[in-house]
Amino acid sequence: MRINTVLFDLDGTLINTNELIISSFLHTLNTYYPNQYKREDVLPFIGPSLHDTFSKIDENKVEEMITSYRKFNHDHHDELVEEYETVYETVRELKRQGYKVGIVTTKARQTVEMGLQLSKLDEFFDVVVTIDDVENVKPHPEPLQKALELLDAKPEEALMVGDNHHDIVGGQNAGTKTAAVSWTLKGRAYLEAYKPDFMLDKMSDLLPILSNMNRS
C-alpha cells in the first residue's frame, strides 16, 4: 500500500518548543509550589495534555494552573521557540510531491497557529487537529482518525511522525505507520522501546523513506 499522507506532531517534532514548555511548567509550578520543582522534574510532563498533568498535581487547581501556563507560554512564545534543521524544506517538498500533510497535537489552536506562523510552516498544512477539536488526546486514536477523515485518507496509507510515545502509540492505535524523531528530549532509546517503524535522525530522512516505501 502506497503512503500518500503524513501526519506530524508539532512540539518537539516540527518546531523546537522544548525550552518554552519547560519554562512554562517551571513558571507555573513555582507560582503555586515555590522551589519544589526542578527542570528534570518537568520532563515527564512533556507529551500528555495539560489537564492530565496538572490534575495529578492538584485536582483543585487544574484550571488555574492551565491558565497560568498558557499565559506564560503565549507571552514568551516567539523568544523561546526555535526551528529544527531540514523541517521547512522537507515539508515543502512533501507538498510539492503531492502528499497530504496534517498536524495532530495536544496544544490549543491559538498557540499552534503562533508556532506555524513563526516557523512559516502555516502555508503547507491541509489539516490541523488540536486539543480543541477532540474529546480524547493521543495515544487515543481519535485525533489521528479525525485528521485522516478530514484529509480523506486511509490509515494504511498514512505515516505518523512524532517525538513522544503518545505519537507512536497513537499511530499504532489508529493503524498508521510510525516514525520517531531521534532529536526527542526524552532520548532515542526511549522511543525505540515503542517500536516505531522508522527512526529519523533529521526530518529530511523522511523523503528517501517514503520513496522506498512507495517503490516496493
Curated annotation (Swiss-Prot):
Q: Which keywords does UniProt give here? A: Hydrolase, Magnesium
Q: What is its EC number?
A: 3.6.1.1
Instruction: Enumerate the Gene3D superfamilies for this protein.
Output: HAD superfamily/HAD-like, Putative phosphatase, domain 2
Q: Does the keyword Transmembrane helix apply?
A: no
Pfam families given in the database record: HAD_2
| Species this protein is from | Bacillus cereus (strain B4264)
Protein's name in the database: Pyrophosphatase PpaX
Positions of transmembrane segments: none
Q: What is the lineage of its organism?
A: Bacteria, Bacillati, Bacillota, Bacilli, Bacillales
Question: Where along the chain is the active site annotated?
Answer: 9
Q: Name one GO biological process term.
A: DNA repair
Query: Which EC class does it fall in?
Result: hydrolase
**Which top-level group of life is the source organism from?**
Bacteria
HAMAP family, per database record: Pyrophosphat_PpaX
Which cofactors?
A: Mg(2+)
Catalyzed reactions per annotation: diphosphate + H2O = 2 phosphate + H(+)
